[in-house]
Amino acid sequence: QMDEGLDTGAVLLQRTHPIGPDTTTHQLHDELAQLGAQCMVDVLSDFKSHTPVTQRVEGVTYAKKIEKQEAILDWSQPAQVLARRLRSFDPFPGGVTYLKNEALKIWSATAHSNELQSSLPGTVLHVSSDGIDVACAQGVLKITSLQRAGGKRLNAAQFIQGFDGLVGAVLHTTDQN
């Protein structure tokens, strides 16, 4: 049955699915594709026993198109906010920051500590094969996967092999040229 609104028509079957604390958009997409396929099989195998049910309209939100500027990481935000943002932006558009006038795409990171930082937000505090620790206004973001412009996605250990003097460098929201 067709309906005039966007995703507002009656449904034959509905399922819930948990979202883990470290789930990326890419992972959620794949999990929901599997769940959706199973739901289709369930409905089609016993179609007559399913009755269309009107969807609730309360609490429904519309996800607008992600704009390019939304990918820019604002280091004055808490580390936990940035880590969630990066998970939501994987596989598109990724997070963007600038290091020494070079655009970097950040793919994955974890938030550590929830304390206010004395370092300037965006300052690289520590580098190891486990990740690149960056000061945020609140907490530290450990970057674990990133990409140089025109390059391929690398884990932190691979990335730091091509960069000297990262500790103390400041990541920016814009190109500093």
How does the language model describe each region?
Residues Q1-A63, E67-Q69:
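Donor/substrate-binding cores of folate-linked one-carbon enzymes
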